[in-house]
Every structure is written in structure tokens, then in C-alpha cells.
Amino acid sequence: ICACLVGSEMCIRDRFISPHFPLYFHNFCSRLKNRGVNVLGIGDAQYSEISNETKESLSEYYRVNSLENYDEVYKAVAYYISKYGRIDFVESQNEYWLETDARIRSDFNICSGTKFEDLAVMKYKSKMKAVYESVGLNVARYCLIDNFENALNFIDAVGYPVVVKPDNGVGATSTYKLNNQAELEYFFATKDERIYIMEEYVNGHVETFDGITDSNKNVLIANSTIMLNSIMDNVNEHCDTAFCNRFVAGSDIEEIGTKVVKAFDTRSRFFHFEFFRLDSDKEGLGKKGDLVGLEVNMRAPGAYMPDMINFSYESDVYTIWADMVIYDKCFIELKQKYLVAYIGRRNDIGYMFDHDQLISQFGGNIMLDVDVPEVLSAAMGNHVYMVRTENQEHLDYLINEFLKRCDGSNWR
């Protein structure tokens, strides 16, 4: 992306990887363009296939045959540099392309974000743990499994169940809970060639600390979500998806999350940190209610969570992000006013209330109502409602009503 500020002597040259996907990512580009920035994108979709919103958010679009082919991406960046000058900012907001972003920064000496040689601690789950520990957080015991005997030795030490996932992976893809040796044997018989990390099972639920930082790692806006069920289970067991946020100011996760922000290279970016909140005492990890370090994601939270923040603050995180990129500050006075829940329903589950009934009964609370692209539906559900209210009791009621089964039973 090349970005030029209209009416200013300052010139920012900025490039956005895959601006067309996920669908709402055009908002990052549009806020820059609305501020007089010339926004240039690189993607592998045909120009005719990208949304009108994305087209209107870009000043120029360079199509490559595949974003997986770095030579093509390199040539695209070189083309933009030859036409517009030096690139100053590179972003995808997509975990899958973080390595591509970082490689471009290294190859073209772009200093506004993490370079490739410094990326490992943000991509490999095994390396993240040491950073969490450096700020005083406990982490689950783990080992990198390269053979069956190594896995058995680890399980002898921690017991079943265990969780396995790619050490360098995206989301909950290829993440499994193994309960016995038969499942372990099946995993080894069917797994791919990637390096997997095996962790002791933690009886807890995931909570996040998300936000935007300036170039000095100061948090400009923050949010925290509480996962009401496991994304791993959503994917593997085809469950509903539900999570909600909290009032973050003064919470323990704000205090700890801010320390984690300082420990990682979070300069000038969106961040999405994950923790376990222990649901029971766990020897070596902590007491019920304690936070345990899990993973970091150096991008905006997914699943329409940026919009959750918008609805909670009655603000616009895309504008805050764009102002951070251009001016390194936030100009908006922020106050979190509402609690918001994300509710993802499945097409093949029978619910008590159909869409029209939900709109009729709860329309005043519904802030977002959208179908989910098939490629994201395993984790997010097929159709999403985002609802908001002013107190936790009413929010819990809304979640339960939206997911209540046709026979009147609760969703969990």
C-alpha cells in the first residue's frame, strides 16, 4: 500500500495484503482513504470478484496468481515502490500472512513493524510461552512431539487428556484433545508433517485482551472477551459459538494484558492475546480464577470482534487504527458503555426461535446480523447475531434465548 496524506508534507507509504478477505477488512483501508491516504492492495482474487466496498477503499489493486508465491508478492511490492516511492507500512491483519508481512519488511527495510528475523516468538506457540513467563504468568507444560515415544514420555508426566496443535498454526485448525492412547495412535497415523506441540490439558476457559497500540506500545483502546465455549470444540464437535466482552477498565486482565503488550513487539498494531482463566485449582498453574498464558496473535481479533468493540464503546476501531497509522495517536475520547455478545448459530441445529421471531422480540438489542463465509463457519457458526445491553444478567438471557433448542432445552 502506498499512502499519501493530502495537504501534508508527510508521506506514508502503506501496503495492505489481501484487503478483500475477510469481508469486513475493507474497513481498515476505507478509513485510511477517507483521511486522504492513497491505499494500495495486493491480493490473489480477480478484481471483478472483490466487493465494491473493497474496490472503493483502494486506490490501486495489484493481482498476483497466488499470495503463497512470495516471488510474485515481492514483484508487486517492487512495482509499487517504483511507482510511488519507499514503503513505510505493511499490514494484512491476518495471522496467515504475518510471515509474508514480516518478510516484506525485512527485504525492503520497512521499520514500522516486526521483521522476519524477529517474528518467531509471535508465530511459534512454544516460543510464546517464555514471553508470558517473563511477565509472571504460568503456562501449561508442553513438549514438541517429533515421535510417538516422545509423546508417551510427556503423557507419562502429565497424564491424559492432552491437547495437540501445530506449533506454527492459525486458529483452531488441526487442534485436538486426546483422551487415551488409541486417540494418540490415530493422531500419529493421520497427522501431517508439521511440527506439533503437545500441552497438558487445562481446565479453564479462554479470555482475551485485545486492542490497538501506538509506536511506543501504549494501548489506545482495549477490549476483553470471555469465550463461553471452546473454539476447538466448535470446530471438532460442530457446536454453537458464543462469547461476550467485559468492562475492561480496572480488571485483572487489563493489568496483566498491558504487561504482555510491553513484553512483545506490539508497536503500532492491533493485538489479540489469549489466556486461560482456570475453572478449578491446577497444581503448578494456579488457583481457580487465576490467569494462565496461552497464545498471542499480532493482528485484529477475528469473528467480527472489531465490531464488538465498536458496539461496546460506540466508537470506531478502524478509525482509531487509521489515525494510529497516520498520526500515531487516538483523537477520540473513549468510554466503554455496553456489554456485547457474539452468537453464532448452525444451519443444521433446530432452535426455538427462527430469524423473524428473534428480530421481532429482540430487534432493539441486535447490532449485527450476518451470514458467515463457509471457509470461516467451522469456528464462527453459519449465521451471526451480535447483541448488546448494559448489564451481564440481560446479556446472559439474550445468549440463552438465541441458542435455546426447539425442545426448550438449554444450549449447553
Label for each model-derived stretch:
Residues 1-12:
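Single conserved hydrophobic/aromatic residue that forms the stacking wall/gate
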Residues 13-21, 25:
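Nucleotide-activated donor-dependent transferases that construct or modify glycoconjugates
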Residues 42-60, 65-67, 125:
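Short, glycine/polar-rich helix-capping loops at beta-to-alpha or helix-loop-helix junctions
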Residues 80-87, 156-158, 192-193:
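Glycine-rich phosphate-binding loop signature in dinucleotide/nucleotide-binding domains
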Residues 82-123, 136-144:
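A short, GP-enriched loop/loop-strand-helix hinge that lies immediately N-terminal to
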Residues 138-140, 161-164, 173-208, 230-241, ...:
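Conserved ATP-binding module of the ATP-grasp superfamily
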Residues 200-266, 270, 277, 281, ...:
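ATP-dependent carboxylate/phosphate-activation module, predominantly the ATP-grasp catalytic core
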Residues 322-412:
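Peripheral (often C-terminal) accessory segments that flank ATP-dependent C-N-forming ligase machineries
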